[in-house]
């Protein structure tokens, strides 16, 4: 494609062609100054031309070197792609728009991509057609009307966010209902919505936000692993940064050496990466300790802060009762003298703290002289023993936000009463104000999000660690089998809502099921205990192997080798449900008729005998049974199910977690699995037929060591 130029009129850019060129990193010069009556065209260096958006799109599909399957890898796929490329034009017809959405939505219920198993120009054509309608699609996208279509659209946007957001910002005018080329003047390039009053602003979202000027921060304290509540804050920052073409920085709020460690820092960075968050840089509040100390001293000199040696319990009581501290009117000299004692970490200094001088009678108790600095002689995980004093979150956070150029600080609504304090601190410091934007904290039933309480479970040995699959940490839920795509969709569906409802887990697991079910391989397992041998008297004298799909609707899952033998294993529960003379269906084989049932003295089934009836109709049988061949190639499995760690839907602040510990949170069942499961890798997600979805936690090592599979909830039960 070297030396090629894309030419089109400024009022009608071929969005699908531009997207395809951008995704495939194809070298091309863009000229958006063609006459209004012309069609998009490729002009080659030798003077040859191709005309028309669909022709150009197909050319990109065929010639994209970095995406070899962009136009399919066989004639059938390429023909299907042609169908979708032609169909994309329907979305530009106002009367047919929703009918088209409905058709594609239904098709995507069982497909990840429109054609084949990877992104193609079929996806590009439909995706661009939707994106190009602007506000009409955005409104539907926020609704729950076309969930499969929205999932597909969002997954493509998430996967190629940097490229696609750039294209959308340049060529899609929100609210206009059609693509337009970006205006050439610098000022007008910021006008995304298109009317003069809303220049630089997308749809109502962050207050006073301008395209390209938004700077956000995600500021976790390194005192634990990232959990699902933190993930909501992190992903909302990511979402707004992408929406406004801004940036996110990660800042570790490392102001409490008693709780923090490098282990937590390392794992937080790992988890942020798992969430797919791209950040400009990593900073630490401790980077600003010298400046924070200077600011505290400045406020004392200006009479806006003082040193207080009131005992902590008395100080809390005075704050509740609105009583001024006896130290409130200390002279500047006395405050600075005690401040030096605090810096030195002396015995006298350890009795003191620094407080802001606000209003002790303010109805909002957060405004009653908040603490700015405390002594803490413990070693800091990053800077060692350099400091004996540390700023509080309430003092350090607004200072560093302003200093780092943060335009909008996202905070959960639990901080609402401290918003006025945040603004007052910045006012007293004489620093630039920062916009605060609230969202509701994520509350889930039977779930602890307090790092202190989670740490208690770790320290008592009730869980295996911070990545325990019963934990709500990112590492824990991923280990349980949750796909990050599901978590992102779940959180963004809630948006920045301030609703504080207690949520069930089943919605999240239902989203996860929609993602894994269309693609995960199918395997077979039989519970080992009391399994029953079913002898087929006319079965094969010699075992034979047949290759069958691991997923009947998804070729990409591959094939598995299934062995057929004269005797097969059934689970006791299945064997006990069969009557003599009953015809049953053996899945992936055919029908069989049970002729004889053997039971022990307690009435338990111990053996079955019967004959094959492969011509029998599977529609007429009541029982469709999973089975395994009687061979020594089967693998040992440990199937692990989990329950909630606590027995109360929501713990109150004064509840002791030890009083509500669930004593039975883990159930292990030994089973046998088909031989193909030897190839499972840690993290693979599969479906065991008639049992559910599982994630491989420990893969096959040797015959004596079972493969460990973790059960993945599917949304039907809140587990």
UniProtKB/Swiss-Prot annotation:
Stored Gene3D superfamilies: 1.20.1050.130, HUPs, Ribosomal Protein L25, Chain P
Known catalytic reactions: tRNA(Glu) + L-glutamate + ATP = L-glutamyl-tRNA(Glu) + AMP + diphosphate
Biased composition (Basic and acidic residues): 195-204
Motif 'HIGH' region: where in chain: 220-230
Positions contributing to ATP binding: 93, 227, 414, 448-452
Annotated motif 'KMSKS' region, positions: 448-452
Record bears the keyword Cytoplasm: yes
Subcellular location: Cytoplasm, Cytosol
GO annotations of cellular component type: cytosol; plastid; protein-containing complex
InterPro entries, alphabetized: aa-tRNA-synth_I_CS, Gln/Glu-tRNA_Ligase, Glu-tRNA-synth_arc/euk, Glu/Gln-tRNA-synth, Glu/Gln-tRNA-synth_Ib_cat-dom, Glu/Gln-tRNA-synth_Ib_codon-bd, Glutathione-S-Trfase_C_sf, GST_C
EC number: 6.1.1.17
Pfam family for this entry, one: tRNA-synt_1c
Region (Disordered): 176-205
Function of the molecule: Catalyzes the attachment of glutamate to tRNA(Glu) in a two-step reaction: glutamate is first activated by ATP to form Glu-AMP and then transferred to the acceptor end of tRNA(Glu).
HAMAP family with a match to the protein in the record: Glu_tRNA_synth_type2
Record-stated family: Belongs to the class-I aminoacyl-tRNA synthetase family. Glutamate--tRNA ligase type 2 subfamily.
PANTHER family: GLUTAMATE--TRNA LIGASE (PTHR43097:SF5), GLUTAMINE-TRNA LIGASE (PTHR43097)
Assembly behavior: Interacts with GLN2, COL4 and RPP13L4/ZAR1.
Protein's recorded name: Glutamate--tRNA ligase, cytoplasmic
């Amino acid at each position: 494609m070297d030396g090629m130029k894309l030419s089109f009129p400024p009022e009608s850019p071929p969005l699908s062609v531009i997207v395809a060129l951008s995704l495939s990193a194809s070298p091309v010069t863009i000229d958006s100054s063609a006459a209004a009556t012309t069609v998009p065209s490729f002009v080659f260096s030798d003077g040859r031309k191709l005309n028309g958006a669909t022709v150009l799109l197909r050319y990109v599909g065929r010639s994209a070197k970095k995406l070899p399957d962009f136009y399919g890898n066989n004639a059938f796929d390429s023909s299907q792609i042609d169908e979708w490329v032609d169909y994309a034009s329907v979305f530009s017809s106002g009367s047919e728009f929703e009918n088209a959405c409905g058709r594609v939505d239904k098709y995507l219920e069982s497909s990840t991509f429109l054609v084949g198993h990877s992104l193609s120009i079929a996806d590009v054509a439909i995706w661009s057609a939707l994106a190009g309608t602007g506000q009409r699609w955005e409104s539907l996208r926020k609704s729950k009307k076309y969930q499969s279509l929205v999932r597909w659209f969002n997954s493509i946007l998430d996967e190629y966010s940097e490229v696609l957001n750039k294209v959308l910002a340049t060529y899609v005018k929100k609210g206009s209902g059609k693509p337009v080329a970006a205006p050439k003047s610098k000022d007008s390039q910021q006008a995304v919505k298109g009317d003069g009053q809303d220049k630089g602003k997308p749809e109502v979202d962050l207050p006073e936000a301008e395209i390209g000027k938004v700077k956000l921060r995600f500021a976790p304290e390194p005192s634990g692993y990232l959990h699902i509540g933190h993930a909501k804050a992190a992903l909302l920052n990511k979402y707004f940064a992408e929406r406004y073409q801004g940036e996110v920085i990660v800042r570790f709020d490392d102001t409490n050496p008693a709780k923090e460690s490098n282990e937590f820092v390392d794992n937080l960075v790992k988890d942020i990466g798992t969430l797919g968050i791209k950040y400009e840089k990593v900073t630490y509040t401790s980077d600003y300790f010298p400046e924070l100390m200077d600011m505290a001293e400045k406020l004392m000199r200006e009479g806006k802060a003082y040193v207080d040696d009131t005992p902590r319990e008395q100080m809390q009581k005075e704050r509740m009762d609105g009583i001024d501290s006896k130290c409130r009117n200390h002279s500047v000299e006395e405050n600075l003298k005690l401040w030096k004692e605090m810096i030195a970490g002396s015995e006298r200094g350890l009795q003191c703290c620094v407080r802001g001088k606000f209003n002790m009678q303010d109805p909002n108790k957060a405004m009653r002289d908040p603490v700015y600095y405390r002594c803490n002689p413990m070693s800091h995980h990053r800077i060692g023993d350099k400091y004996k004093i540390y700023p509080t979150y309430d003092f350090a956070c607004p200072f560093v936000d302003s200093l780092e150029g943060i335009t909008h600080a996202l905070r959960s609504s639990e901080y609402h009463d401290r918003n006025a304090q945040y603004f007052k601190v910045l006012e007293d410091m004489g620093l630039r104000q920062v916009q605060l934007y609230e969202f509701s904290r994520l509350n889930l039933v039977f779930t602890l999000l307090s790092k202190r309480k989670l740490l208690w479970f770790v320290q008592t040995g009730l869980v295996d660690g911070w990545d325990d699959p019963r934990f709500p940490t990112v590492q824990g839920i991923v280990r349980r089998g949750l796909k990050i795509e599901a978590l992102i969709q779940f959180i963004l569906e809630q948006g920045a809502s301030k609703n504080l409802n207690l949520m069930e887990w089943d919605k999240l697991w239902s989203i996860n099921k929609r993602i894994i079910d269309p693609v995960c391989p199918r395997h077979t397992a039989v519970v080992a205990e009391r399994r029953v041998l079913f002898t087929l008297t006319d079965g094969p004298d010699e075992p034979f192997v047949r290759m069958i799909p691991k997923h009947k609707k998804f070729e990409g899952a591959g094939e598995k080798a299934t062995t057929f033998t004269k005797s097969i294993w059934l689970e006791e529960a299945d064997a006990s449900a069969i009557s003599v003379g009953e015809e049953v269906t053996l899945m992936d084989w055919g029908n069989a008729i049970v002729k004889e049932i053997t039971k022990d003295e307690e009435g338990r089934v111990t053996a079955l005998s019967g004959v094959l009836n492969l011509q029998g109709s599977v529609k007429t049988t009541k029982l469709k049974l999973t089975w395994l061949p009687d061979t020594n190639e089967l693998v040992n499995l440990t199937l692990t199910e989990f329950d909630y760690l606590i027995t109360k839907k929501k713990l109150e602040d004064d509840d002791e977690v030890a009083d509500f510990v669930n004593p039975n949170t883990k159930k292990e069942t030994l089973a046998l699995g088909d031989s193909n499961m030897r190839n499972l890798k840690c993290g693979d997600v599969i479906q065991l037929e008639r049992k559910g979805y599982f994630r491989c936690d420990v893969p096959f090592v040797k015959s004596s060591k079972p493969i460990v599979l973790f059960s993945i909830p599917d949304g039907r039960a809140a587990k």
